Amino acid sequence: SSDLNFDHAELSIQNITELVIALNAKTRSSGLPLGGSEGDYSVNQTSTWTSGYPVRSRFARKHPEYDPHHFSAEQLLKNGEADALLWVSEFNPDKTPPNMNIPKIVIGHTNMHANDTDVFIPVSTAGIDHTGTMFRIDSSVSLPLGTLRESSLPSLVEVMTAIEAAL
């Protein structure tokens, strides 16, 4: 996980594992990953639920085609096969699109500073500015998200619905 990108991260995992083992000597205990996925698991689950296939699928032939290598965003961009880039990141303002010489549409966190963007649409954040649903990191449970504050920004769902209606 990218959350464990630091020196000796494996020692932290080993310590947690040893703690769970020690606790299990007298009681019951388990360790669950809680690292943030920034919605990756939810997107993958939604794609699988709606199309029968996870992300890295294409729909150019009116039916889903799944190929995790050829249809990865990195591969398509690297090979110059993308006409434009739609970048969506409502949770992390530091997750910005790669610097590519193609048109970029960014739908993102209001504090995102995406350089060289053709279109930027700020959105509110699920679980903070509006309700929503996300999948837990183990992809087995969907969790309802509440609202902590009011926002004048549209939600990602509202923006995507408006784009779809305009097409």
Short names for language-model regions:
Residues S29-R56:
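Short connector loops at secondary-structure junctions
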Residues S2-R28, S51-L167:
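Non-catalytic alpha/beta scaffold blocks inside enzyme catalytic domains
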